[in-house]
Structure formats: C-alpha cells, structure tokens
Amino acid sequence: RRQRQMCIRDSYDTNGDGIGDLPGIIEKLDYLKELGVDIVWLSPCYRSPLADQGYDISDYYDIDPRFGTMEDMDRLIAEAKKRDMYIVMDLVVNHCSDEHEWFKKACKDPDGKYGRFFYLRDKEDGKLPTNWRSYFGGSVWEDLPGTNKQYLHVFHKKQPDLNWENPELREEVYKNINWWLDKGLGGFRIDAIINIKKALPMHDYEPDREDGLCSINKMLEEASGIGEFLGEMRDRTFKPHDAFSVGEVFNAKDEELSLIHISEPTRHLRI
C-alpha cells in the first residue's frame, strides 16, 4: 500500500485563515486516491500549545481547533473508508505537554498519583539528578513549578517524559489508543518510541563536552527491556483491532530492534 504523510497546517485551507485543516484534507481525498495513495498519515493534530510542532500534546482526546474539530476527524475517517483508504495518526507517548492535565496535577501533588506519571527527582544542593543532555540541548532536568523537585524531559523542556514503568500510566495510554481505534482509525505511527525505556537506576555518564553533560544516546544504549512494553501495547491495542503500527526507532541495539520487526508472535511493531 502507498502512504502519504500530510502536515495538516500545510494542506488545503478551507476557511481562509492561512492554516490547512481537516476539511481541506477531506476535499482532497479523491485527488489523493487518484495518485494511488491508500494510507493518509496525519502529523500531530491533537490539542497542543505547539511548542514542538504539535508533538507536545495537551489533550489526547481532542483536535486542535486550528485544524478543525472532532466531528471533522470523524468525517475524514468515514470518507476515507468509502474510498478504501486508511487514516493513520502520529502517536506521541514518550512525553506529553507541560500543559496536559496530568502534568498540572503532578505540579500540585508531586507525591500523588499523577506525580508518578512522570520522572520526578528531588533537588539536592543544586546538583542535577543526572548529567544527561537532551536532544534539544542543555540538561534533561527542569524545575517542577512550585516544588523542590525536577522533572525529566529528553526533548523540549515543555515535553515532560511519561513514566512507562508505571502500570497506571500505561493503562491510560492503551485506553487512548483503543479509543481512537474504536473510532475507525487505521493505526498509528509511534513517535520516538525507543525513548520510552530508560536505563534504571538513573546515573551519570562520562561527560562528552565542556558543558559537563553527556548525550542522551548513552543512556539509551544501556537501556534494555523495551520489548516488554511494546509487546504489552501490541496485545492490548493493535492486535485486537488488527491495526497498522509503525515505530520511529533510532539509537537502538540490534537485539532490541529484532524484537520490533521480526515475525509474529514476537513482532511488536513494524519500523
């Protein structure tokens, strides 16, 4: 099948606000079909403050009003099915936005349920919990507002990492995936999936620059066990729906990659 990625803001604009929208993609489905496209992959269109092109999600159950409404999304899925086409969305579950309700609740009660949805560490005499450098540069640690703690973010500081070691967090992720698949979504392209497994317990590495920090890649090289998370996610979500899945993978060890792309029953995702 032939796939086409669609950055919605750069797609057809139906209301003249200068931003592409979901109704615009609906209008162009026939054209895409003529091109031989079977799968339309949408870049993030969830509600988001857009600190990182929509990869900072503040509500996994809503469409950002810049791009349309949930009714528009339902119509897009339905119209695509009429043409024997599938809609695939980006799934961003290594992190969320710092404007997500989970994170807001974590700030209010860092020792409570939602504090455990993230990687929080106490501040100790001005020393960082680890010397890891984020993909965006600088430390992966940022002060948790109103507390004496810091939170982990391997990407932008407005993208706190979700704690996949917490079963309650994983349940919320699976619940959301199934909610979308029940709507008729064809599947997901899962963003930065290799990052959901951290090397624990967290510790420092030899600095590789004068800033005293070390590339986050060093931690990923040491992390192991992502196959357990991916297998659970597959069995709880994609497999029952016979849904499409593809993962963005980088800096993975060969043995970890083998768990992701080899044939059933051990294949967790396609890459």
Predicted regions located by residue number:
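Hydrophobic residues within beta-strands of alpha/beta enzymes
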Residues: 40, 188-190
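Catalytic cores of alpha/beta
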Residues: 256
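Single conserved hydrophobic/aromatic residue that forms the stacking wall/gate
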Residues: 1-10, 260-271
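Acidic/aromatic-lined carbohydrate-recognition and catalytic surfaces
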Residues: 2-5, 9-178, 182, 195-253
